[in-house]
Amino acid sequence: VYFLAALVDRILEVTGRQCSLVEIYGKNFDHLVKFVSDFPAQKVAHVTGVSAGQVNQIAMEILAADSAAFHLSTGVNQSGQGVLAYWLNEMLSLITGNLGKKGGNYKPVGFVDGFTSTQGVTTVETSLGNLRFPNPMGPMSMPGAILADLIEAGDIRALIVVSGNPLLSIGDENRTKLALEKLDILVSVDIFPSCTAELSDYMLPATDFLERADVALLPNMMQSVPYVQFTEAIVEPKYERRHIWWIFSELLQRLSLVSSDENNHNDNGFHLVDAFLAAGNLSVELLRDVPDSLILLHQLEPESFFERCLVHPDKRIDCCPDLFFSSGLFVRCEEFYNELEALFDQLMLITLRTPFMHNGWMNNVDKFRRGKHANNPLYINDFEAEKLDLVEGETVRVSSDAGSLYAIVSISNDLRPGVVAMSHGYGQGAASQLRVASQRPGVNSNRLAPTGWDSMEPLSYMSRLSAIPVTISKILTWED
């Protein structure tokens, strides 16, 4: 956040705040200017590790380029200030004239080629406080950071987990486990077992990607070459595996929430897919009949972005929404900065993504669980390792306010000073049906992540799974 704020501030300083796209499409620009001016490059350099000279060089290279695209990814939105980071990333694209431009950032077309503006909010009342979700999506993403709290308070008494493993993916594993055990019923629907499934009252086996027909909806409006494709099932489901739609259809009927006439097993859910496809004058039947069941969509010019994507009545981009003020994001940002200054000498743990582990999906793949990847090493650069008198392969204790764990040191100068890293997804030791994963589980780094109402980001309700202050200590004896 502070690096992006400094970069935006420097670019505005160099350009004299002259931004043609802002003049045409922007509003509340002065509030953006005020926010970034509080975090100039020289001020934040010791927190970001990026000098004012480097920020200036990056700014000048962006301004000199014919075009530039800006991208943030998963680790940023999990670091406690994802909303502001993504906002500043979009503002960077806007003020440099790279939004809606070839070579810059734009939105490809899709078979549903449009956006729905926010229409009010849905409020969910809980024992902890009220959660507000923008419509039309509504409460589709309840925050995992307070799952244990909601279970302990009695707000959640039954839980159905679909293709997930909250025991590992949510912070404070021990507390999450105790909470899940208090549920009246826990059901897991998945294609293979997991630690969470082991705790479940029922494990329901679902079909895999070869056993079901499909139209990929998720990539819509995210493809550089936009297309839509229908794929038939390749093989019949084995054993007692069932399609997810069938499982929920059956549950709804047995709970008397719908009648068999409303939700019969001859309805495979494709009428809902057809409703999406109809926006592009497409249908599942049409896709079945074309070669390869694939239709390429006509791509529009990137400059069509503003006409297609601005759905506010005034057709303007709010450069600094009032909601950021009212939700306390800016006050929180200042508090985070003060915390970073106070913890300047403390190490920060970030989550690592490698080809050997992705979201826990590769826990049971033998060839990916060899050597140091059989465990979940703590990566640290040699400067920090020397300060702590650590050597390659040494076992250390890593502690945060939320918990502690043991990890094996792996020295890597790919990391900057002040930062250590561990992979997300390890720790399936309790999944007894996964031979490799249970024998070589590695350690779950999310044990160090905080939970509870104060740990999640306002607006997004995102958990803080990265940028966690930690201390590392040598193990003198195993009694330590």
Give residue spans per PLM region.
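A glycine-rich phosphate-binding loop feature that marks nucleotide/adenosyl-phosphate handling sites
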Residues: 25-27, 62, 105-116, 264-281, ...
